[in-house]
Amino acid sequence: MNGSLIHILTRPRMMLMIWGGIGALFLIYVMASAAVQSANRPGANGPAYAVGAKPVRDPKLLIGDMAKFSYAFSPRRAPATQFNDDAEGSPVRLTDFSGKAILVNFWATWCAPCRKELPSLDALQQRLGGEQFEVVLVAADPKGRTAAQAMLTKLGVSAPTALMDEKLALASAVGGAAALPLTVIYDASGNEVGRLLGEADWASDEAIAIVNRVIGPENESVLMP
């Protein structure tokens, strides 16, 4: 019996089948290993998951007003949509801010929650704005630049970059034309970190902590006084 089995297993066709099966298993192993390495490579799935030893997307930071902040766990890039292209402005794209983290806030003059949170965004820019981070206010408002600037002046908001999206081109591109205010944070590579729909206190320690985690660990001790 054993002799017959050995004879069958040593036939050329059977040998080819055996070695073919071994080769297929080896190929599956190589492909699986490559997939795991690719998934674990920094930046392979959109925004970096960690700055230093701390994760950028940290559920522990979602407290207070920031409990409404939603991390972007699927890759989303800052759209290259042109905006600020009204008669008085120069065309701008979010990609123009590449190299620094940005907080983009969509607001309008008719939006009461927007008006309430704008001073806190001004305070955030004054505290953290610089080479690594910038607050960008985008007025998604058909009333136009004059009305938007008058409202900012009335509220005493002057520190952030103020731009227009009168035709809602950018707001639509980020999926936020339906409701305001909407705030979206992008890292220095143009990857969306997350967004918050509705009013928030962006001068709070909780907001500062989220922004600092995106900027880098060297800034994490910086809190509002």
Please place each PLM-identified region on the residue numbering.
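A short beta-strand-turn-helix
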Residues: 70-75, 80-102
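Alpha/beta-hydrolase fold active-site loops
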Residues: 101-102, 133, 181, 191
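Thiol/disulfide oxidoreductase modules built on the thioredoxin-like
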Residues: 150-159, 164-216
